[in-house]
Amino acid sequence: MSELPIELKGIIASLKAPDELWLTGATIEEEFGEITEMTVEFVTKGPIVLGDVVGQAMSVSMEGEGGFRHFGGICTSIERVGEKVMEDSVDVGYVAEIRPWLWMLTRASNNRIFQDKDVVEIIEEVFGDHGFVDYTKKLNASYEKRLYCVQFGETDYAFISRLMEEEGIYHFWNNAVNAGELSKLILCDNKSSSHVDTPGMSTIKFTGSGGAGINLDHSVTDWTSAENVIPGKVTLNDYDMLTPTVSHQVVTETVVDTAHSHATYELYQYPANYRKDTARGNRMAEVLMEAQETEYKVRHGATTSRNLAIGHKFTLEEAPEGEDGDYLVIAATHYIRPSISQRQDHNQLIRDRRNLQYPEEMEGMDYQCRFKAISTDIQYRSKCKTPWPSMTGIHSAHVVGPSGEEIYTDEHGRIKVQFPWDRVGQNDENSTCWIRVATPWSGKDWGMVAIPRIDQEVIIQFENGNPDRPVVTGMLWNEDTKPAFPYPDKPTELGIRTNSSKGGGGYNELMFDDLKDEELMRVQAQKDHQFLIKNKSVVTIGLDEIDAGAHDEDGSLSEVIRNHVTRTIKEGDHYFTMEEGNEEYTIDQGTQTIEIEGDKTETIRTGNHVHTVQTGNMETTVETGNHETTVDTGNMTTTVSTGNHETTVSTGNHTLDVSLGKSETEAMQSIEFKVGSNSIKIDQMGVTIKGMMIKIEGTMTAEMKSMMTTVKGDAMTTVKGGITMIN
């Protein structure tokens, strides 16, 4: 077996001359979707300063077929593990842990919100925040914009890992021959366009453990194949408030022709993370199914070829049991140590930890690669193994919106908030997505509605603990928004008080005071009040139980009041209209007084107006002004069954005008008209006219006729005419 050089590079090499620093061993573990873990052992002549090494770039290089391979990264940990004291020097042993730059994302965590970005844009933003640009995208799929995506309480690496696992993106580090001194991160999502043949080794033969005359440098020495039971389909479902009655279920069945009879098993997941976007749901189900299919048939092998590289394809020939075919390396562990001729005896180091462990069959070898591969017919996907953060408990936030607004909502009564942990949001309408607001009662065009207003503090909880699905479940008082009632002085007061918008300064209120013996219910309308009762209303005041009164029919208002009723209109008019029906006032005991400073007009368009005084008097007094009764059509009848009917005009005139028809006055005893000492009296005995002067004038004729007529003048009697006839 040929001996090819292996070098340890980096800041350590610059600290010591080549003859004062030598590599004693290294292991490198890499796998799709994982961070490469590299452990290096080395010895120096004399101690080094650990602080000069940690955090610096380091790499192990080895020569392969056609060029060099470089495994490198950042020294994340270094440990002094032992020493060998000699007469004139000290050999010191060290173990360094080396990780690629992606590992640095495990050292950073954040709470932040991404909006209207796809998964690739989010990943690139996270990389860019740390200044990392050494990656290549070999992506074939199109990724939908995520309206709202939250990182909370998780490292940057965990955050992007769970997103990639969900979307079917995986990554590896390209450290193949001639790939460059710095391993580059490759982002993949497709078996056809993301992977190429292994440089310098597109075809490799299976030789077994070898034999005389067999060159093991370019062969597979171990090969095993395993098959596993996988489910036959993946079913996902989700819910979206915009389509609440629509099923969003998607199903993806395996494309693998399984040899077992258990393909009827199903993986069911709810909620999946696609809302009503079933196209995205189908892709997610496909990714989950492909992750299962990746594990259906896997191969494990070993080779001493230094060219075999993760993320690359090779063709296996002369394999056992018909295993010839094209394969993709999805994981590899590299064991490296100096060639026998380059090794020095450091077993005499006084060590505080054991040496790196190598496979037993590596004895006498300087390199071996143990790898895991799948057929290139299978689309690799990583399993969703990175946990999502679970948003347990409650969170608080403040309602936000555009500048100058007090209430900001959409047609569904949703709001936007600013979380106190969000360092990016600007406390405006762009801080979050629209967030649903829980209510004690909701229905189609009915329920309880109270939109949280800007600057109010709200309680946020999350659907199934999903950080991407917040819901407002309540509200909280704080120092800036104190309770509406005077606590703690009046702890018995409770109720609802609103705030006039915009600008405040007024409110509507429904207040209750439960103070014993002083209980109170107060209602305030800041401006207008509308009250609609579609059947009947019963109001009882001053009693312990409801009393419907005399009328309890549908469409009725019944008011029973034990004591007084006072209505005062300080300014304006009082209109009372009965479109149909009767009005009845009954005062069983007591009096009624109506006092009007101006006019009173009563108009009865059709029907009768009846005033009945059963016992007592009826008196109408107009101190100043007029009293006018008008009947447009019909009759006016005044009836006094027992008692008197008296009309008194203290100052002014009394006029009776019958334009058409007649005026008739009838009395049982007498009718008398008086002016001063003059009178006309009509009684049962006759008609008596008395006056200081009586004039009877007939324009054409005047006739006085009776059975007996007496004309008498105590002083003088004059009978005068053009012709006077006395018979």
Language model features: what each stretch is:
Residues 38-48, 293-304, 441-447:
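Short alpha-helix capping/helix-loop boundary micro-motifs
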Residues 52-53, 307-308, 452:
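Short, well-ordered loop/turn sites that connect or cap secondary structure elements
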Residues 66-74, 322-330, 339, 465-475:
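Short, Lys/Arg- and Gly-enriched loop/turn segments at beta-strand edges
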